[in-house]
UniProtKB/Swiss-Prot annotation:
Entry superkingdom: Eukaryota
Database matches in InterPro entries: Kunitz_BPTI, Kunitz_BPTI_sf, Prtase_inh_Kunz-CS, TFPI/VKTCI-like
Source lineage: Eukaryota, Metazoa, Ecdysozoa, Arthropoda, Chelicerata
GO BP: any one term: envenomation resulting in negative regulation of voltage-gated potassium channel activity in another organism
One CC-aspect GO term: extracellular space
Protein name: Amblin
Signal peptide as annotated in the record: 1-15
Amino acid sequence: MGFLVASAVLVCVTSQRVPGYCKKKPAVGPCKALIEKWYFDYSTQSCKTFYYGGCGGNGNKFSSRKKCREACLPKRPSVPVCKQMPDPGFCRAYMPHWFFNSKSGYCEGFVYGGCQGNDNRFKSCWQCMKKCRTAREANRLCWKLTKEFNKKFLRNVPTAKPLPPK
């Protein structure tokens, strides 16, 4: 009986094995660009951002959190995008975005900080509603929602003024 239990545990662990490149530390590379990428932090079993230099590096470099998770945590179940809570991330930029509120059933505004966060983040009401509801509902609701969004989030944002000609 003990042998059967040990075999079952071994099968479970090896079927969820993390690929070798996901265990490497992120490598910036020798170039000097600042390109936001994602890497898998093996010690915390999570995907995090880093700034890639633009050349070199290693395989632990992904264009999105989703791609990082798919590559390094392929068996882990995830919460559907439209059911995730809005996550502003840990940066402090002021970037108004949209998220789908599964309780109210429509898209609402929130302030994204510019990095991290989750996939329930959209640049427009239409993108949000088309992903989480339907295009027909997006056309019906987004004109009104966008007007409210602009009043709430864009009213006090300083606007750039053109420089006078020299």
